[in-house]
Amino acid sequence: MAERPSASRQKAYRRGHRGEWLAAAALMLKGYRILARRHRTRFGEIDLIARRGDLVVFVEVKARRSLMEAMEAIGHESERRIEAAADIWLSRQADYGRLSMRFDMVAVLPWRWPVHVENAFYGRN
């Protein structure tokens, strides 16, 4: 029988879902269409995949106390994981050849509207 997650882990999970919901809402208000949430691959998970026109945006959502903390929370290992997962997702798209991609971050801060940071990091492509 599987153990129940601790109360703090459950709270973090709920906070993550709320943050991703807020981030998705902020992106939709900017004209993006959400294609996937918590997209899992063998390399890891992409929080949100959004599209506007021929631009596909792979979004890492960070709920932190400040924008600086959110930016610092994306390390090189996270970048590599997101890039590898993005490559897999893109390769499965029929219109792969005409799509542009970008790696963004949405910071979910206390009592503020989410902050969308375009080009939070640059992929190796």
From Swiss-Prot:
Tree of life domain: Bacteria
GO MF entry, a single one: nucleic acid binding
Xref: SUPFAM superfamilies: Restriction endonuclease-like
Gene3D superfamilies in UniProt: 3.40.1350.10
PANTHER family, per database record: UPF0102 PROTEIN YRAN (PTHR34039:SF1)
Family statement: Belongs to the UPF0102 family.
UniProt-recorded name of the protein: UPF0102 protein mlr4633
Organism expressing this protein natively: Mesorhizobium japonicum (strain LMG 29417 / CECT 9101 / MAFF 303099)
Source taxonomy: Bacteria, Pseudomonadati, Pseudomonadota, Alphaproteobacteria, Hyphomicrobiales
